């Protein structure tokens, strides 16, 4: 069965995650089952949308979809099981949290999480499958909001502007302040900063 045929099936969930690359904060996944009777215009990969457009689409997706759910893995879980496994687990949690059980899941990327229904990985799915685009949008909006909250809890790193990604501002703050509780110690720049802080203490 090809992608066009899958897209025509009822009860197909689109699944995507955001936040694999950042040095801080959770990885967040979403699963969305769109309602064919309530189409949403402008769905595309969240990275290609402005923040304001993502926010507007987030509202529409939540209002018009048959079901949506979010799942995440914390920095501690990421450090324990690695970022790839944490991304898959976050996606699994999102699908399992759906109020409607999908007949099939279409997952962005080249790997599928462990699911109790048929699942297919779709390369560049966030640009090709509307339900995956919708999942990428609500996952991105939710994660950005979490990072704004973490910025208030852990000031000085600029988490609310770079969302935890390894920008020069973030790396400089890590060097100066050391890691916060929301940083991922398994990521090399964070680990090096933690080791330098340990050396400085002694």
Swiss-Prot record:
It comes from the Bacteria. Keywords: Cytoplasm, Endonuclease, Hydrolase, Manganese, Metal-binding, Nuclease. GO terms for biological process: DNA replication, removal of RNA primer; mismatch repair. Residues 10-199 form the RNase H type-2 domain. Its cofactor is Mn(2+); Mg(2+). A divalent metal cation binds at residues 16-17, 108. It holds the Pfam family RNase_HII. Transmembrane segments: none annotated. GO terms for molecular function: manganese ion binding; RNA binding; RNA-DNA hybrid ribonuclease activity. Manganese or magnesium. Binds 1 divalent metal ion per monomer in the absence of substrate. May bind a second metal ion after substrate binding. Its main location: cytoplasm. GO terms for cellular component: cytoplasm; ribonuclease H2 complex. Its EC number is 3.1.26.4. It is found in: Cytoplasm. It catalyses: Endonucleolytic cleavage to 5'-phosphomonoester. Belongs to the RNase HII family. Endonuclease that specifically degrades the RNA of RNA-DNA hybrids. This is Ribonuclease HII. It comes from Thioalkalivibrio sulfidiphilus (strain HL-EbGR7). The gene is rnhB.
């Amino acid at each position: 069965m090809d992608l066009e045929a899958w897209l025509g099936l009822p009860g197909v969930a689109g699944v995507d995650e955001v936040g694999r690359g950042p040095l801080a904060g959770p990885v967040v996944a979403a699963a969305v089952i769109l309602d064919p009777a309530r189409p949403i215009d402008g769905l595309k990969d969240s990275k290609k949308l402005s923040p304001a457009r993502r926010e507007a689409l987030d509202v529409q997706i939540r209002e018009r979809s048959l079901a949506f759910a979010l799942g995440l893995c914390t920095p501690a879980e990421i450090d324990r099981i690695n970022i790839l496994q944490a991304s898959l687990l976050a996606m699994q949690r999102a699908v399992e949290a759906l109020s409607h059980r999908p007949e099939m899941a279409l997952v962005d990327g080249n790997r599928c999480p462990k699911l109790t229904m048929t699942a297919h990985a779709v390369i560049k799915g966030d640009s090709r499958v509307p339900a995956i685009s919708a999942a990428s949008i609500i996952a991105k909006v939710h994660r950005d909001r979490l990072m704004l909250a973490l910025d208030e809890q852990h000031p000085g790193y600029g988490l609310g502007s770079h969302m935890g990604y390894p920008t020069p501002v973030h790396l400089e703050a890590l060097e100066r302040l050391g890691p916060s509780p929301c940083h991922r110690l398994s990521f090399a720049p964070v680990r090096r900063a933690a080791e330098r802080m340990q050396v400085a203490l002694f």
